[in-house]
Amino acid sequence: MAHKKGVGSSRNGRDSDGQRLGCKKFGGEHVKAGNIIYRQHGTKIHPGNNVGLGKDYTLFALIEGVVKFERLGRDRKKVSVYPAS
């Protein structure tokens, strides 16, 4: 017989916070140089014109302009920033 009640499951009680990944600026939105457009793990979305790729795969604007999401071939996506006309 056990001398203590089954308290157990102390290995379960944790729930880590989300990492806030995803789209920060949407298509058609105006951005300034340096604004973060997309946070991701790996190149879910590739950098297009006037968009930089950080070491953690963050996509950011290199110039001031308007965000545009585009296709890159059949099964890839890219995001570009075009100067506002």
Swiss-Prot record:
The keyword Ribonucleoprotein applies. InterPro entries: Ribosomal_bL27 (IPR001684). One of its GO terms (biological process) is translation. The keyword Transcription does not apply. Keywords: Ribonucleoprotein, Ribosomal protein. GO terms for molecular function: structural constituent of ribosome. GO terms for cellular component: cytosolic large ribosomal subunit. Residues 1-24 are annotated as: Disordered. It comes from the Bacteria. Disulfide bonds: none annotated. Pfam families: Ribosomal_L27. NCBIfam families: L27 (TIGR00062). Belongs to the bacterial ribosomal protein bL27 family. This is Large ribosomal subunit protein bL27. It comes from Geotalea daltonii (strain DSM 22248 / JCM 15807 / FRC-32).
